[in-house]
């Protein structure tokens, strides 16, 4: 759960979105 592209990493719990 790292800052990949947007703030959706914390919402999705995934990778690059």
Curated annotation (Swiss-Prot):
Single GO biological process annotation from the record: innate immune response
The entry's keywords: Adaptive immunity, Blood coagulation, Coiled coil, Disulfide bond, Hemostasis, Immunity, Innate immunity, Secreted
GO cellular component terms listed in the entry, alphabetical order: extracellular region
Key word 4Fe-4S present: no
UniProt keyword Acetylation, yes or no: no
Function comment: Cleaved by the protease thrombin to yield monomers which, together with fibrinogen beta (FGB) and fibrinogen gamma (FGG), polymerize to form an insoluble fibrin matrix. Fibrin has a major function in hemostasis as one of the primary components of blood clots. In addition, functions during the early stages of wound repair to stabilize the lesion and guide cell migration during re-epithelialization. Was originally thought to be essential for platelet aggregation, based on in vitro studies using anticoagulated blood.
Localization per Swiss-Prot or TrEMBL: Secreted
Name of protein: Fibrinogen alpha chain
Native organism: Sus scrofa (Pig)
Gene from which this protein is expressed: FGA
PTM notes: Conversion of fibrinogen to fibrin is triggered by thrombin, which cleaves fibrinopeptides A and B from alpha and beta chains, and thus exposes the N-terminal polymerization sites responsible for the formation of the soft clot. The soft clot is converted into the hard clot by factor XIIIA which catalyzes the epsilon-(gamma-glutamyl)lysine cross-linking between gamma chains (stronger) and between alpha chains (weaker) of different monomers.
Subunit-level organization: Heterohexamer; disulfide linked. Contains 2 sets of 3 non-identical chains (alpha, beta and gamma). The 2 heterotrimers are in head to head conformation with the N-termini in a small central domain.
Domains as described in the record: A long coiled coil structure formed by 3 polypeptide chains connects the central nodule to the C-terminal domains (distal nodules). The long C-terminal ends of the alpha chains fold back, contributing a fourth strand to the coiled coil structure.
């Amino acid at each position: 759960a790292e800052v990949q592209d947007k703030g959706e990493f914390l919402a999705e719990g995934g990778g690059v979105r």
